[in-house]
Amino acid sequence: MVGRLQGKVALITGGTSGIGEATVELFVAEGAKVLIVGRNADKGRTMVSALGDAVRFFQADVRHEDQIAAAVADAAATFGRLDILFNNAGGGTTGGVTDFTAEQLDDAVSLLLGSALYGMKHAAPVMKAQGWGSIINNSSVAALRTHMGGYLYSIAKAGVTQATKLAGMELGRHGVTVNCISPGGIATPIFFGGSDRAAAMAEGHLEASMAKLERNLAKATPIQKSGLPRDIAAAALFLASDEGHYVNCHDFVVDAGMTAAGRNNFEAVA
């Protein structure tokens, strides 16, 4: 089925790489107009050149509320509406209970949690005025189980999951659904920012490290397959489409059974 987002307008943060890039490409293929939000202007221009008039790039750092507000305003002004918000931007964090810095804490909270809160804050009025909208937040299995992510990362993502449910309760009466996706082991370069061990694994050998990551992630799931960005993009497509209209306040876990498999399987990843 093609055209599941025909006539819809989406804003996707972190849209120039990994899950975000895959989602932009899928949404465009399904008929959407997309505002790509990200910091990498060169990559943004490349994507606009490749995808044409269906997309527009807006350079922004989602850790700052004024920049998110400007992106939402740009989407509404350019396309005349905003049907879908995918708060996808994120990154890995390091540090444990006793060895994180104030800067690391601020960065984790502002990037992983604050960006989603600001996105919802500024998109919600536009969607409420329309009487419809779909907000999707990118959370993580690290919000559900221990040993699935770093200390600060896991805490921030748990906040994203809870904020999703609270926002869905508040906005549902206005025709706006709010859901989150909790990816399991998805093979993207962003993985290597999640721990010192993982970063060392990738240093200077990203292509080989990605191949190794995919093999190791496959071992952590019952179906023996690594997740790829397009798997999360497909979940976002369902939630954003009319087919997902009855889903609200839901945490859509896309992990091939990783959380069921448990700690020992995941610890083999890196």
List each model region and its residues:
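Conserved glycine-rich cofactor-binding loop
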Residues: 16-17, 40
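C-terminal substrate-recognition "lid" of short-chain dehydrogenase/reductases
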Residues: 79, 117, 132, 223-254, ...
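Substrate-binding pocket helix/loop in short-chain dehydrogenase/reductase
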Residues: 96-97, 104-109, 135, 217
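Active-site helix of classical SDR
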Residues: 120, 156, 164
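Alpha-helical segment proximal to the catalytic Tyr-Lys
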Residues: 125, 169-170, 245
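Residue(s) in the substrate-gating loop at a strand-loop-helix junction
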Residues: 140
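Short, small/polar-rich loop/turn modules that mediate ligand/substrate recognition or access, typified
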Residues: 172, 177, 247-249
